[in-house]
Amino acid sequence: MTMLTLDDTASSDPKHGCPPEDRPIEALLDAGVLMIDKPRGPTSHQLTAWAREMLGIQRLGHGGTLDPFATGLLTMLCGKATRLTDIVLTGDKRYIAILKFGREVSDGELIGLIGTLKGEIYNVPPLESAVKVQVRSRVLHEFRLIESDTESRIAILTIRCNAGTYIRTLARDIGLLLDTTCELVELHRDNTGPFDQSHACTMQQMTDAVFLLREHDDDRA
């Protein structure tokens, strides 16, 4: 378990309850945050439903939806922790994106374009998104090229941005500005708000932990 301070202005009466590290697993599942390392394939809703059934809890919601093809950090809130939705889910996100272009794009051309897109941009949700399709402004705090292969027309980028930024839309706009097609072929989220990859577990790790708890009364997993 990792301790993170989400609200440093909050206080509690020490006469009631106990520190999080001393709470039983039942209390943690009634008011905890789970970070799942989402695999490629299932939807965020499917993953949450599986986790809810596996853990045997009624209230488990997720936020920061990832498309089925995307991987990485998916936030799940247990029980009373759903009250923290606004605090937990409004933080910046960081992604690693793999793009494939319709023509050869030089590093200089791509880096030059990336430089013009840092800061505030207009970002329209895709038609298939779950939110209302309308123009919205978002901020790209970090946007840089990690690696590229000009011959195969592939580029790997890292992006740190506001919550609610649609990377698929950003990829489309990059293609338009370069006068070519640009396909988002892979997307991985490795940071969301105060959480990073070190805070996450896979569904297999969760399955193993639940088995140890139920069959061997071992909650250390």
Role assignments for model-derived ranges:
Residues M1-T71, L77-A221:
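Non-catalytic RNA-recognition surface used by pseudouridine synthases
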